[in-house]
Amino acid sequence: MTTLTDLTLAEARDALLNKDFSAVELVKAQLAEIEQARALNAFIKETPEKALAMAEASDARIARGEAGPLEGVPLGIKDLYCTEGVETTAASHILEGFKPAYESTVSANLWRDGAVMLGKLNLDEFAMGSSNETSYFGPVVSPWRRKGSDARIVPGGSSGGSAAAVAARLCFGATATDTGGSIRQPAAFTGTVGIKPTYGRCSRWGIVAFASSLDQAGPIARTVRDAAILMRSMAGHDPKDTTSVDAPVPDYEATLSRGVKGMKIGIPKEYRIEGVPAEIDALWGQGVEWLKDAGATIVDISLPHTRYALPAYYIVAPAEASSNLARYDGVRYGLRVPGKDIVGMYEATRAAGFGKEVRRRIMIGAYVLSAGYYDAYYVRAQKIRTLIKQDFDRAYADGVDAILTPATPSAAFGFGEKGSGDPVEMYLNDVFTVTVNMAGLPGLAVPAGVSAEGLPLGLQLIGRPFDEETLFALASVIEKAAPKIAPPPKWWA
């Protein structure tokens, strides 16, 4: 028998409108799952009272025939999104106890459409990480385990709490953010669907900034349809965000039945990199066959500046982070550590408040922006960024509708397995995803298979600017063709 929490978001939405059960019943079922799953550490802050109050309001609207598109659907919110009156920490000690007096635009859009907030989800501190091991509140544990092993594995990052919560059936969907792969990589690691929309499609207002020219909000969900439903509510123009684009938001769910026959799909040769496991290459080849079978045409393409994307990203992103994080000084909000004078207070607060990875990136950013190195590093990285964007522009000008690549260079790994001695080892997790952020394009990760160890593997689709519809249509084809991945056994219950 299917329990309420095993329903997809689309099924739950339709059943609520059909009055098969109430929003309060659904929220209570979800809260019980969350209580059982504390070992995953997916939530930083649970909000059961708020969730039940919102569910009661949803039931009243449904009874009056005033239901919104997400009426009564329980969601998790990445703790990078400001939520009015609810603690927002960015998983950092420096923001512990901070309660915003305002709501982020994206979460406000979700509440406008009737969604219910279950709580705030864990993440890498200030979204800086690829494994969710850098959170001040402890790492998130993936609900997945390798075959025959009880060893904990990472859910990916930085949106590890979002991905783990969705995969473990703790919520029907979750908000996330993606600066270099932080939606797509954890989605691939946990067998969920994650989309990073085109830069400007979703408002950044009220989301704690990491790298402002790269950050973008997006959803993580169990199915392509669920992600499409969430995207429609999250997206939209916001005059409070100067990078928000004033363009109509399509009905993404309606595009899922759109055929892909005649579409031209590019396969970039530069994504065939040394050291990638054979099972990743095999999955990529299988994805090609699925799209061929659906009537798409496959063409080889070249994105020649791909090899420079990762080093350029790790100059641009820390540079912007060092600027954005300068505002945390202990004066107005969050942690304050006393010092002998005002400068001493600044220094003591920032030293105690920021974790190791955040401090590392602030120092890298300050270095590349310094007078003697600005031209040698930052300016050159921005020039490379332009060349990366031009590579994609040429591919799309030649008639390519979308690009298919692996989502990650491996399946999920264990705690402490990567980056403990050399941080670059961890940064290489973003090798297939950072180009998309550097070019401001939409990218979607869809589950496509499992590794030899029984862990989820994903494929990535990269689209033209503001053409998320094509990505959803293609992802729907892959989702239907791929073997169904059973949810992870509830070892934590």
Curated annotation (Swiss-Prot):
GO molecular-function term, one example from the UniProt record: glutaminyl-tRNA synthase (glutamine-hydrolyzing) activity
Disulfide bonding pattern of the chain: none
Domain of life according to the entry: Bacteria
EC number from the UniProt entry: 6.3.5.7
One Gene Ontology biological process: translation
Coiled coil: none
Active site: K78, S158, S182
Keyword Nucleotide-binding: yes
HAMAP family, A to Z: GatA
Quaternary assembly: Heterotrimer of A, B and C subunits.
Cross-referenced PANTHER family: GLUTAMYL-TRNA(GLN) AMIDOTRANSFERASE SUBUNIT A, TRANSAMIDASE
Protein's name according to its UniProt entry: Glutamyl-tRNA(Gln) amidotransferase subunit A
Origin species: Methylocella silvestris (strain DSM 15510 / CIP 108128 / LMG 27833 / NCIMB 13906 / BL2)
Name of the coding gene: gatA
